[in-house]
Design a protein with these regions (language model features):
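ATP-dependent carboxylate/phosphate-activation module, predominantly the ATP-grasp catalytic core
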Residues: 169-228, 239, 251-277
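Conserved Lys-Pro-Asp/Glu-containing loop-to-beta segment of HAD-superfamily phosphomonoesterases
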Residues: 375-393, 398
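Alpha-helical substrate-recognition element adjacent to the catalytic core
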Residues: 284-373
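ATP-binding N-terminal substructure of ATP-dependent carboxylate-amine bond-forming enzymes
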Residues: 1-93, 410
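Acidic di-acidic motifs
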Residues: 4, 312-314, 387-391
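Active-site nucleotide/adenylate-binding loops and adjacent lid/helix of ATP-dependent enzymes
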Residues: 99-174, 185-188, 214
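A short glycine-rich, hydrophobically flanked beta-strand micro-motif that places a catalytic Asp/Glu
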Residues: 230-242
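Non-catalytic pre-domain segments flanking phosphatase-related domains
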Residues: 246, 254-311
């Protein structure tokens, strides 16, 4: 997958990383990107797609790691890889080159669909603008980059002086929708699901929910009949001042908020992989009510090396009668990595009974049940250990006497990380 650190790349990762049929690799040209915190198999140091050596560098990675398919995760990359498919050592997952070329240009998209769908009015010059505000948009681009809503001619002239290639188009004030689609290798539109874009941040939809309506299915069929798609794609429409749905853009790739339909059972990235393998697929979507709200997610990387974890029970692993599921996730990560778990507690009741009620009785390699007044620090025997406790006093005592890292429950999130090797260039 390339570039693996984009929002699109991260959605592809979430779509494919748990499938047992797929070994997933992420690659990037940018040293600082979120992909390096996520991918178990991560490769950096690729040239940019504009570099003459990009294809050779990509082919080296493909051959070195036995890559079968390349999944593009950005519009510009999508077009570049489609243009260079014959020179690449593996197959690119995506639609044919001509479709990619049309979809990567708003002007070309509008020219193709103007005879059959409503598209935004384009103004060849500012003299032809009938009313303000208008939109200025790059011909190519995604996620709202370089888009300006301009209320006056003076402001429009300011932006056009900086970038004469911007398209001047009508402002559409209504609701906005994305329709997530999948077309199989036979050209059949197998799924089209609409979702309303309820909140936009930096051009990305961060709050969305599914919507029904035959009009969205009709639009999807019309677009699918005009362009040749293969695999995942989507299009966006927005209501005009009269409520008319107007085609904004089409993209033959994964969208970040496709996670909404993925959680209803439609995994667009996985469907596209199987379709690229010339496999027939079946789609079974759930119909319960759902909405998605996205926010920045933190991932951490530390230099900690440990073979033992000591953890407190009361108000730490179990709080107010409820299991701390975030902490349990970390403890099971330790189990997967062969780290030994020690429960260290002054619990006043039967520890076995409490763990049994919480269904945690077989989780720990050792249970140390201290009496009142006994110091937890004296029970910790290893130097390659961590200590987790809600009590600052307990953490301070352990840190000062044992010199090991100590964590409050809220800080355990920094310990949740992919067990990945060092990045390979």
């Amino acid at each position: 997958m390339f570039p693996c650190g984009s929002e699109v790349g991260l959605e592809i990762y979430r779509s494919l990383s748990t499938d047992t049929h797929i070994e997933l690799y992420g690659a990037s040209s940018v040293a600082s990107n979120h992909g390096r915190f996520v991918f178990r198999n991560y490769v950096d140091g690729l040239p940019y797609i504009t570099d003459p050596g990009f294809i050779d560098a990509m082919n080296s990675i493909i051959r070195d790691h036995g890559i079968d398919f390349l999944f593009p995760a950005m519009d510009g990359v999508l077009l570049n890889l489609a243009e260079n498919q014959e020179q690449l050592a593996c197959r690119v997952i995506g639609s044919p080159l001509e479709t990619c070329r049309i979809c990567c240009s708003k002007r070309a998209t509008y020219e193709v669909f103007a005879p059959i769908l409503r598209v935004p009015l384009l103004y060849p010059s500012l003299d032809e603008v009938p009313a303000w505000p208008i939109f200025l948009k790059p011909d190519s681009g995604y996620g709202g980059h370089g888009v300006h809503k301009v209320p006056s001619r003076d402001e429009a002239e300011f932006f056009l002086k900086r970038d004469k290639s911007l398209l001047a188009m009508e402002y559409l004030p209504g609701r906005e929708y994305t329709i997530d689609c999948f077309t199989d290798r036979h050209g059949h539109l197998r799924f089209a699901g609409a979702r309303e874009r309820l909140r936009i941040k930096d051009g990305l939809c961060v709050h969305s929910r599914p919507v029904g309506g035959a009009i969205f299915q009709e639009l999807a069929r019309t677009i699918n009949a005009r362009l040749q798609f293969r695999g995942v794609w989507f299009f966006q429409v927005k209501e005009s001042s009269r409520g008319e749905l107007t085609l904004m853009e089409i993209a033959p790739r994964v969208a970040g908020t496709m996670a909404l339909h993925r959680n209803l059972g439609v995994n667009f990235a996985l469907l596209s992989v199987f379709d690229a393998m010339d496999m027939d697929v079946h789609i079974q979507a759930n119909d319960f009510q759902i909405e998605i709200d996205r926010a920045v997610t933190s991932r951490f990387r530390t230099d900690l090396h440990y073979r033992h974890v000591y953890v407190d029970l009361d108000d730490c692993l179990i709080c107010d009668g409820f299991v701390n599921t975030s902490l349990v996730a970390f403890l099971y990560q330790c189990v997967n990595r062969g780290v030994l778990l020690h429960l260290l507690t002054r619990h006043r009741r039967s520890v076995d009974e409490t763990l049994g009620q919480a269904r945690l009785q077989n989780l720990f390699d050792e249970v140390i049940h201290l009496q009142a007044g006994e110091a937890k620090s004296q029970a910790i025997r290893q130097a390659d250990a961590l200590f987790i406790d809600d009590s600052f006093q307990e953490r301070r005592d352990v840190h000062e006497s044992k010199g090991i890292p100590v964590f409050a429950p809220d800080a355990v999130e920094c310990l949740m990380q992919s067990d990945q090797p060092e990045a390979r260039s």
